[in-house]
Swiss-Prot record:
GO terms for molecular function: acyltransferase activity; acyltransferase activity, transferring groups other than amino-acyl groups. This is Acyl transferase. It is an enzyme of class 2 (transferase). GO terms for biological process: bioluminescence; fatty acid metabolic process. NCBIfam families: PRK13604.1. Belongs to the LuxD family. The active site is at S117, D214, H244. The lineage of its organism: Bacteria, Pseudomonadati, Pseudomonadota, Gammaproteobacteria, Vibrionales. InterPro entries: AB_hydrolase_fold, LuxD.
Length: 306
């Protein structure tokens, strides 16, 4: 892993079963002298590609972090598969594959995980079984059934699987309903209780960010999850003025970047909280990173179509 241009991520390909692959982007610390103890893995939410988190990667790398992003299998983005075949278990497999790749192929054992929205539910599922340094979630789903009901305006999980419409629109994409719902029931992804059971023995430092105007994730359910964790290394913070869409405007987006970075720096130093100061990337640097990533994505997509 070597970088010659810190404004362009390094593109990696992890081969998985049946000639499929997971695409990974790696961003190095801007100043090697100030690099942190942990590598950060960012798990994007549903219908979000890794390039949607260019700004967060820029904030974290400006503040000394080595950052890894990836696109899940059967999802939007550059990895194999189509989003109408996505399931929570496929998302789990993708995240575990990336973490194992870091550890086995590159000897990186100190890993902090940042997961948003639907990917947070996946993070909650693996956190007790994977050797992480810390976990940060943002608008993290804890009650998948309730979130789906809020997003889809109806509780489709009460229906027989054969009766569920196959072309449900979830956040602008066609959710392969039968694949997704079957996996939810077979692998216990759907309830708040299932999430609590997965996290009650969590023993790594954990900070959860909720949004005070989030109709998809209920703050009291996140608080219930936290209260059932047998650890004193947890905290919850509110992103004031935000809905579930953390990119709805520049003020909300900047607050999200700042808050996550403050939490990551604190947790990297074994403190459960937020540091008071961070280095703010220049607007020009954020713009350059975004443009370069868009070009890289287009280049990769063009090659795959050739």
């Amino acid at each position: 892993m070597k970088s010659e241009n810190n404004s362009v991520p390094i593109d990696h390909v992890i081969k998985v079963d049946n000639e499929r692959h997971i695409r990974v982007w790696e961003t190095f610390p801007k100043n090697q002298c100030d690099k942190r103890n942990n590598t950060i893995v960012i798990a994007s939410g549903f219908a979000r590609r890794m390039d949607h988190f260019a700004g967060l990667a820029e904030y974290l790398s400006t503040n000394g972090f080595h950052v890894i992003r990836y696109d899940s299998l059967n999802h939007v983005g550059l990895s194999s598969g189509e989003i109408d075949q996505f399931s929570m278990s496929v998302g789990k497999k993708s995240l575990l594959t990336v973490i194992d790749w870091l550890k086995s192929e590159h000897g990186i054992d100190q890993v902090g995980l940042i997961a948003s929205s639907l990917s947070a539910r996946i993070a909650y599922d693996i956190v007790a079984d994977v050797n992480l340094s810390f976990l940060i979630t943002a608008v993290g789903v804890v009650n998948l059934r309730n979130t789906l009901e809020q997003a889809l305006k109806y509780d489709y999980l009460q229906m027989e699987i054969d009766e569920i419409p196959e072309d449900l629109d979830f956040d602008g994409y066609n959710l392969g309903s039968k694949v997704f719902v079957t996996d939810c029931f077979e692998n216990n992804w759907d309830t708040l209780d299932s999430t609590i059971n997965k996290t009650k023995n969590l023993n790594v430092p954990f900070i959860a960010f909720v949004a005070n105007d989030d109709s998809w994730v209920q703050q009291h359910e996140v608080e219930e999850l936290m209260s059932n964790i047998n650890s004193d290394k947890t905290k919850i913070y509110s992103l004031i003025g935000s809905s579930h869409d953390l990119g709805e405007n520049l003020i909300v987006l900047r607050n999200f970047y700042q808050s996550i970075t403050k939490a990551a720096i604190a947790l990297d130093s074994n403190l459960v909280g937020l540091v008071s100061e961070i280095i703010e990337p220049q607007f020009e640097a954020l713009t350059i990173a975004t443009v370069n990533e868009r070009r890289l994505k287009n280049k990769i997509q063009s090659k795959s179509l050739a």
